[in-house]
Amino acid sequence: MKKTSLSSWHEKAGAKIIDFGGWLMPVQYSGIMAEHKAVRSAAGLFDVSHMGNFYVKGRRALEFLQSVTTNDLSRTVDGQAQYTIMLYENGGIVDDLIIYRIDSVTFFLIVNAGNCDKDFAWLEEHAGAFEGVQLSNHSDQLSLIALQGPKAFSILSRVIPEIDADRLPSFHFRQLPFMGAELMVARTGYTGEAGVEICLPNALAQPLWEALLDAGREDGLVPVGLGARDTLRLEMGYSLYGHEIDQDTNPLEARLKWVVSMEKGPFIGREACRQVELDPRFGVAGFSLEGRALARQGCRVFNADRQEIGKVCSGTISPTLQEPIGTASLVREYLKPGTPVFVEIRGSLQPGQIRRLPFVKPALL
């Protein structure tokens, strides 16, 4: 079982530790509800060092990445990040990821922890056609810390004075100094709140973590586990691999058409996307339920005539709205907000309705 550079800190802090994709990770500290509300009202600190990270370098690096991802990376500039997807030829999703353009020949990729080995092997398989492209896996050498919430930048500025929120637009990053080294600070996140994700050498993870907690204590900054990370992303309607998206899901049927550039030229899975674009059958929608029953992944969804129309992707009790919410993959004619639905939970049909995403609208990135 793998551990992050902060594992001993989490254990000493009394975090509940779970196996998450082969990593021992904190799922909660004080409690999911309290941690969630802290991020929405003040700030939260996340250890997400289990995420995979690769470098792609070389004269043809951009050309290579354009061929294996769906978004148009050529539209980015140095210092900009882009959310994108890698597809199989049949249009199923290998993974969703963020690519950071350091310069025209150097790119940094952050991928999902559970897909790290698969993703790297898949990239290696396709890199051979692009002479000079070099791939390297740095997942065991780098840590990733996320600071999220409306007070995130105020707290960060006390530890890294060089940060300037006005000079760091959404999905851009800067190299900033800390303890004689450089950190990559990106204005990205998985909560819908303002904030950053910071990539740094393992040796600096605990010093930065503790410095941020000290700087933000009076503002209500708390450590946050993977449990609240999931409820935060679900309130925003963000996809999670293995739930809203997987190897059997086409992005055009998962609310991800906006990251598929059909105009940029050839990429793996393009023809499959074109076929779905002509005749999409399914889509992902948000829903809420009456009462307090909690829908889980795989629960069947029915229409008002009790005909099965899809399955639940994710479900939780929203800490912000105090009601059961979730996402479901449904036949397209049932995606309109306000449409009545019924979710089968432990043999009983629970009434609800389709809701517009996101469920909440905090101060965005």
UniProtKB/Swiss-Prot annotation:
Q: Which cysteines are cross-linked by disulfides?
A: none
Q: Which reaction does it catalyse?
A: N(6)-[(R)-S(8)-aminomethyldihydrolipoyl]-L-lysyl-[protein] + (6S)-5,6,7,8-tetrahydrofolate = N(6)-[(R)-dihydrolipoyl]-L-lysyl-[protein] + (6R)-5,10-methylene-5,6,7,8-tetrahydrofolate + NH4(+)
Question: A Gene Ontology molecular-function term?
Answer: aminomethyltransferase activity
EC class (word): transferase
Q: Which GO terms describe its cellular component?
A: cytosol; glycine cleavage complex
Q: Which residues form a coiled coil?
A: none
The UniProt entry's GO biological process terms, in alphabetical order, are: glycine decarboxylation via glycine cleavage system
- The question of whether Transferase is a record keyword is answered with yes
Q: What is its EC number?
A: 2.1.2.10
Per UniProt, the keywords (alphabetical) are: Aminotransferase, Transferase
Q: Cite the InterPro entries for this sequence.
A: GCS_T, GCS_T_bac, GCST_C, GCV_T_N, GcvT/YgfZ/DmdA, GcvT/YgfZ_C, TrmE/GcvT_dom1
Can you state the subunit structure given in the record?
A: The glycine cleavage system is composed of four proteins: P, T, L and H.
User: Which protein family is named in the record?
Assistant: Belongs to the GcvT family.
Q: Which HAMAP family match?
A: GcvT
Q: What does this protein do?
A: The glycine cleavage system catalyzes the degradation of glycine.
Q: How is this protein named in the record?
A: Aminomethyltransferase
Q: What phylogenetic lineage does the species belong to?
A: Bacteria, Pseudomonadati, Chlorobiota, Chlorobiia, Chlorobiales
